[in-house]
Amino acid sequence: MRALVVLALAGAQALAPSRRTFLVAAAGGAAKASASTDGVVQQITLPEAVKAIITDANPDWVRAVVQAGFVYRGVAEASPTLRRDPYDLYSPATYNSARAATYFRSLDAALDKNRAPGPRARKAHLAVANAEAAAQWGTAASIWPLGATTYAWGPTVFWPAKDRAITVAESLRVDEGLADCIRDGREVLYACDASIAVPVSMEASLRAGLGLL
């Protein structure tokens, strides 16, 4: 059944015209949108979220989620949202730690030096395959990157770090094995143009809408 769901979602993504440009543009002008200098969040309905996931969610991400489970972030909103979140891993305020900000800068420096593929913390976000862990940051919501997405994973959590940034950079798995990451309950660093977030309280309805029951 799960294999059929993956094929159905992938088929819909291949056949349907992309709605991503429309969705992102709508987020910029919607009355319900809250925007910062480099971030936009728009509240949407669950049916809109389901449709966007089916037509625009990254196929590799969807495939891994179907195989292994959802990936979450903590968000401020209690309803489904279309998101272009500001990048904050370089900010000491994110973890209330200057060392954390330095760590992510060092991680990027190591990746840049090695010309490694994949995301960079300066233009990426962290999600985790554990709703309780995500809830420490707000309302736990499953995350569905839209369109082209790159991701990397390795440590159980990126911060607090158990290893030096250069060591982590050398051991990251990039754009592969996301289902393994999810099964292990690890964090994943990902970069995309926009994403859909659906609160865990609506997960049963989301699963029904996506045919994942």
Q: Model regions: which residues?
A:
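N-terminal chloroplast transit peptides
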Residues: 1-16
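Short amphipathic alpha-helical segments that mediate assembly, nucleic-acid/protein binding
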Residues: 2, 19-20, 46-47
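Short, flexible beta-strand-to-coil junctions
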Residues: 10-11, 73-80, 129-131, 144-149, ...
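N-terminal secretory signal peptides and thylakoid transit peptides that target proteins
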Residues: 15-28
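ADP-ribose/NAD+-binding catalytic cleft of ART/PARP-like enzymes
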Residues: 36-120, 192-213
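ADP-ribosyltransferase catalytic core
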Residues: 112-172
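Active-site and NAD+-binding cores of ADP-ribose-processing enzymes
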Residues: 145-213
